[in-house]
Amino acid sequence: TASDITVNGVITTGAQSYTGNGITVAAASQSTTNNIQINALNNVSINAGLNAQTLTLTSASGKTISGNGDLVASNFLLNGAGVNYTLNTATANQVGTLAASIGVGNLAFQNSTAFTVGTIGAVSGITTSGTLNLASTTGDISISNQITSTNTTASAVVINAGKSKNSRDNTDGNVVFGTGIRVVLDAAATGKIYSGSLAETTLATMIGSGTGRFRYDSDEVTTSYTTALSTGLYGIYRQRPTLSSAASDVTKTYDGLAFAGNTSVTYSGYVNGDVSPNVAGYGANNTINAGSYDITVSGAISGLGYDVTPSNFKLTVTPRILTITASASTKVYDGTNIASVLLASNKIATDSLTLAQTGATFSDQNAGTNKTVTVSGLSFSGASAFNYTLNGVSSTSTTANITAKTLNVSGITATNKVYDGNTTATFNTSGVTNATLVSGGMVAGDNLVVSATGSFADK
């Protein structure tokens, strides 16, 4: 059974190789012109620095190689199948070229300076089905050989160049891909590549211009975009590109709804083939009431993280044309043409309006059906009145019936006659007067002539 090994500071010009169960680097070891190789069967703790021409770290599947010791090497090879490498806590790692083939193992590594993912011996690029997290504190990360991940999580691959820089600081730290070199992901996974400058990286070529898989003004801490990432590979820049905006004036009719935004706003200055990103509000300001408003389109294009050069447009909300309709009631003839009406309108249901009129008249006072009723002097008032206009219309019309008035006639008498063989009767109407007619229901002022016909019950 292999024993545990503690490396207590070995400084040579020759190669160093350590094989044991668990290995602890307790003091700095150096072989600057040759190689250091650590082969373990258990966990490896790197608590002090290692400095070599080529540094190789391996252990058994399921074990962990970790520590705060600074790793300095021209070539850094990780080839432990299934080994988990946690090497992102040291502050002064200085690796020139990194290559890894680790099977199901996870790899987290942060270099203090620029480094390259390349080829070391028989290992080219990085191959893993675990999670991959690479970072440089400052400096570029150059991807010269392919990175292949079969991990299926939302953090399958994270590459972050210039991690010490904040969003909007696009200096010193870009991810640069060699010609034809790619990051290959599982279809269910998400990968994120954080880079600084649009001009000094090659993400558009590798990810694909026009794919919509780019975000801006963001880093691993600050997220200035709101359009969520789905599966696939994304390029996330610290740089904040700026769009110029232009907008046409907008006129809308009052409808009780807030102005949702100016869909005529156009933008120029897109990068990476982006088109029509989600512009927050398009200059919306929740304006509802009639009036004229100056609105500024500004702020960030929240979907992707762009900034916008402000522009102005005028919003005019015109009053809604109020259409007042009337319904008239049927009435019994009363000698006048006065009508009784109810008013209604096309106002917004939740608005407060009071409708009024100064007169409603039938075409004449006489009984009849479907008689025209004219309603004049239309007006309205109320808390919402300023949002409406009659547009010069002051009257409306409808129809209704005037039914005949029932008349009770008294004062008619039958005249006596000599038998003449028939039942014909004659009547005396002299007892019918205006007074008796009015008392019987005639409208005062009307004139009626009463006549009567009839017959005896027998001859």
Which residues are covered by each model-predicted region?
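Extracellular lectin-like interaction modules
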Residues: 1-240
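Short loop/turn motifs that initiate or flank beta-strands
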Residues: 2, 57-60, 70-71, 78-81, ...
